[in-house]
Amino acid sequence: MNAVTESAATTEMPAPFVFTDAAADKVKQLIDEEGNPDLKLRVFVQGGGCSGFQYGFTFDEEVNEDDTVLNKNGVVLLVDAMSYQYLVGAEIDYKDDLNGAQFVIKNPNATTTCGCGSSFSV
């Protein structure tokens, strides 16, 4: 397990991805609604979609040995080793605007995305 704490302190390892306050706050709200403080947000990449890969989000109680763990505002974000390589440098955000409310991943590794934005290729 690789643990990373997102912080302004210069002595800590920089976070491999950006987990925004808006995303962490929304996850915290969803966990509170579920009533299970052991839940953690798992972000993953899997094959599929029209561009080859797609993002997935799920709640998980378990931390796997190969997970990278990021803590933000009391919320734990998990990324497995396979997904890590596709998500390094990405920003995981939550947007609530005229287009609706959703988690959004801005990924600098994606070379193309589909029209709906739910799949990508590298």
UniProtKB/Swiss-Prot annotation:
Q: Does the keyword Lipoprotein apply?
A: no
Identify the species of origin: Burkholderia mallei (strain ATCC 23344)
**Cofactor comment text:** Binds 1 iron-sulfur cluster per subunit.
Which is an annotated Pfam family here? Fe-S_biosyn
Q: Does the keyword Iron-sulfur apply?
A: yes
Gene3D superfamilies recorded for this chain?
HesB-like domain (2.60.300.12)
Keywords of the record, alphabetical order, are:
Iron, Iron-sulfur, Metal-binding
Task: Specify the domain of life of the species encoding this protein.
Answer: Bacteria
Family per UniProt? Answer: Belongs to the HesB/IscA family.
Listed NCBIfam families? iron-sulfur cluster assembly accessory protein, PRK13623.1
Protein name, as recorded: Putative iron-sulfur cluster insertion protein ErpA
Chain sites annotated for binding iron-sulfur cluster: 50, 114, 116
Binding partners and assembly: Homodimer.
Function in brief = Required for insertion of 4Fe-4S clusters.
Q: Which GO terms describe its biological process?
A: iron-sulfur cluster assembly
Q: Which cofactor does it need?
A: iron-sulfur cluster
Which Gene Ontology molecular function entries are recorded, alphabetically? 2 iron, 2 sulfur cluster binding; 4 iron, 4 sulfur cluster binding; iron ion binding
